[in-house]
């Protein structure tokens, strides 16, 4: 039975860069999708974030973090561990076409997590406005060495106290 109530969640949207490139065959795409699922699951576990709701899109994942998890406490370790998993994956795949690079977008707002998917305005903002923004695409394409680029919404920045921007280190994680 659907739930109508929305609560405030940190919503993280992750999308694989150029997942449908012509040189990526179906077996390679499937391997990449499986690896991404493992990377995100491991990152959530290492960050001690339990009971998150996830939607697997094939070449990406949408995550609604539990509402009781403070935004900054959740995001910093999650992004760090996703970056660690990406670096490990990419170092162990000699073929460039099997390497994974991600666009990550984050919003804080209303969401309704179901057992296997998430809905709500926070997801729409993270996906439609941020994840597909040219700013985020340019940030990732402008540095071929970094495994991901991260963009947070104005609301997330305001509520979490990240106003003024966040400095990312050489490895694409907060320092």
Q: Where are these predicted regions, by residue range?
A:
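Catalytic NTP-binding/metal-coordinating core of nucleotidyl cyclase/transferase enzymes
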Residues: 1-73
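Catalytic beta-strand-to-alpha-helix segment of the class III nucleotidyl cyclase homology domain
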Residues: 68-171
